Amino acid sequence: MAGMSPMMVHYLETKKQYPDCILFYRLGDFYEMFFEDALTVSKELEITLTGKECGLEERAPMCGVPYHALDNYLYRLVQKGYKVAIAEQMEDPKQAKGLVKREVIRVVTPGTITSAQALDETKNNYLMGIVYIDERFGIAVSDISTGDFLVTEVASERELADEINKFCPSEIICNDAFFVSGVDTEEVKNRYQTVISALDSHFFSDEGCRKILKEHFKVGSLDGLGLQDYDTGVIAAGAVMEYMYETQKSTLSHITTITPYSTGEFMIIDTSTRRNLELLETMREKQKRGTLLWVLDKTKTAMGARLLRTYIEQPLIHKDDIIARQNAIEELNMNYISREEICEYLNPIYDLERLIGRISYKTANPRDLISFKNSLEMLPYIKDLMGEFTTPLLKELWEELDPLEDVHDLVSRAIVDDPPVSLRDGGIIKEGYHEETDKLRHAKTEGKTWLAQLESRERDKTGIKNLKVKYNKVFGYYFEVTNSFKGMVPDYFVRKQTLANAERYTTDELKELEDMILGAEDKLYTLEYGLFCEVRDTIAAEVLRIQQTARAIAGIDVMTSLSAVATKNNYVKPRINEKGVIDIKNGRHPVVEKMMRDDLFVANDTYLDNTKNRLSIITGPNMAGKSTYMRQTALIVLMAQLGSFVPADEANIGICDRIFTRVGASDDLASGQSTFMVEMTEVANILRNATKNSLIVLDEIGRGTSTFDGLSIAWAVVEHISNPKLLGAKTLFATHYHELTELEGTINGVNNYCIAVKEQGDDIVFLRKIVKGGADKSYGVQVAKLAGVPDSVIVRAKELLVELSDADITARAKEIAEAGAGTPKHAAVPRPDEVDLQQMSLFDTVKADDIVRELGELELGNMTPIDALNTLYRLQTKLKNRWQ
């Protein structure tokens, strides 16, 4: 570093401490980057790359961003997965002796960003810590912007995947063992657009992790936090806490609680089910419109929007908890006038959770405090209205809601109603709040009057008509005279600067006024800054009260949203049972009915139980509505268990521990799996993890392979699921394999349903109605016609359909079903080694005549291509003659 400037030496020393970060180094009004960081940032942000002399042979690559636009540039870099260390000036350069003191004040990473501009207010921004120890995964999750902090443990990769999918963390930190746990970390990165990094081993010391948690939460034992059964989870939580301390370099005083949870406390919804049911985003466009969240979200606050997402992702499994939410919604429905008033008062409320986070971090600006104050103004009105309700959940929310009138009063007295964004420009503290501030402000105001008087006197004295007193930060106050009047300037004017069209001067009197005014301004700005920090710290000390109120507001917001949706959409309060019965009368798909106009949606019934109606085989043509019907049932069950009313005339919902769906066909390009492989992987997951209390939705199992393989797999899956000794889960099973309808009457609990279709000549009309019985046709050719397939193809398809229908496998399917009727259901189809295997045995109904026999005896290996074609032509002619 010989020959380098002291500033550049300090820059490199600082950079050495943060080698994995881009270093934003404050120099005056800019944050500058040098060397590799400059090359990276200029490319990623598309900003100009320049150079700086630093004592080396070549100029150092350099680029910079304005300090007032920091958040925007930070957000763009963090979105791309970079970490950024911010080195700030710790003293006023005017007062500094020698090199200005600078130090890193925080490190911003994808999981620790707190800027309101950078965050989606409707979503949490999670940092996840994962440790893999003794074949268990400890998981800790924190949203540093809101103070949420949760911990759990799981034993399998599948459970871990469910938790990652549930929280969709922006950043994952882990121990080295995680990379050899069997988890495909590259797939996790790509699928969730997250950053994964291993931390040094000291982050995962059991003793160190326990110590940092006890110190932060001020407890002598972690048992008091409910962490006694989470040994691996504690290590994950301690690592996350230390990482947040190291990056934020603050006390994290707004993280006041840690919540341990078991994955079994809520309905488990795996990754494919979340995707297939389109709970939070659509499968194709990845948009909110067209999802269950889109239908249910009428929340007014950011806190409520985030909580509603959590409700959808974590449906309840305890009857009392579900009924508590239902009763709250019902009472709000009955008192809709009060509900609408509450919504009006909720609407102006800002994001209290994230505001108190920024206040605790000391990053909140004056306008944040005004937003905070304006939000608090609504609380007394909401408190009064909530006092009218009597249901336990609404009473609990009323009790938790603290109007925070003392905090509101403090901000109202101290901060002006329309303050500047910057803390350093003054104009923050309201008149009458602090005596010394008022005095200095008066001196500043009078000083401007004195300047105006001086300007008038000098203009009269010199005769310079356009003489003006002006100011800038470099030269202070000065007289400005245009060149046309330069000859009239008196001798006591001292030149300060020459411009192209004017000259700038000062005088003894102007210098005296300048010292007086600027002295008052400097003192005023310093005093105002100190007073603002006092007010901010006073609010931060009330973090527990504010967070409790924020949670209450979020809960009220979600309940009023669900109530408003139930009223508008004619939803009903479902009964909840623990007997495994799902009985829905005239159920409707909550999303599809909102996407359709003029109430055209056709409602349908669903009945499933644990005995005689375990598995419904649903047949019917494509486009008839099978998938919509099955998704509709799953969504109604999920809505009921999150406590919502449901789209039906009547519903009685048995609590499900999990919902599984296998709907639709798509290759998983991210993991390199074909459609069929994806399908079989998901089926395997269902068969291994479902219980008799689960709801399973399977659509078209067995596609992507040969007809016989597909039918065999689908058949075996039906037998396995419907067998109460093996599984016995409630299931909706849509299929094009009409042969499976033969299982009704031979396997207990299996029933056939189909989509009603009306034929009009060669055309069909889908009635969208589920009726008892199996479909006798697939109507595939008619669907192709509806889709616009050319007439010539349709005509040929009809000809082939007639020919191929002769090779009917239905009769053989019926024989197998009846043969299996007296055997255990999981062995209904005889094992391959227990039967006389014949090639294409399902086609035994096709008579093995001389043509078939001759085909079987052909020695293709000894035939030339011409011989083979001649033989094929002869056999074809023989077959045609027989048909004629």
Predicted regions and their residues:
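Charged catalytic and DNA/RNA-contacting regions of genome-maintenance
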Residues: M1-E331, N347-S360, A364-S456, T823-P830, ...
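ATPase nucleotide-binding head domains, primarily ABC-like/P-loop NTPase cores
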Residues: F35-A38, Y230, K300-T301, Y311, ...
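Active-site phosphate-binding and catalytic loops of NTP-dependent enzymes
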Residues: A87, P110-L119, T251, F389-L393, ...
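Conserved catalytic alpha/beta cores of large enzymes that bind or transform nucleotide phosphates
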Residues: I164, P169-A177, V183, A198, ...
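Amphipathic heptad-repeat alpha-helical coiled-coil/stalk segments that mediate oligomerization
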Residues: F204-I212, V219, M267-T271, M283, ...
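Amphipathic alpha-helical coiled-coil segments
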Residues: I322, I329, R339-Y345, F372, ...
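Charged, surface-exposed helical/loop "interaction arms" that form contiguous linear patches used
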Residues: D351, Y361, N365, S375-M378, ...
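C-terminal tails and terminal domains of large nucleic-acid-associated
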Residues: S841-Q884
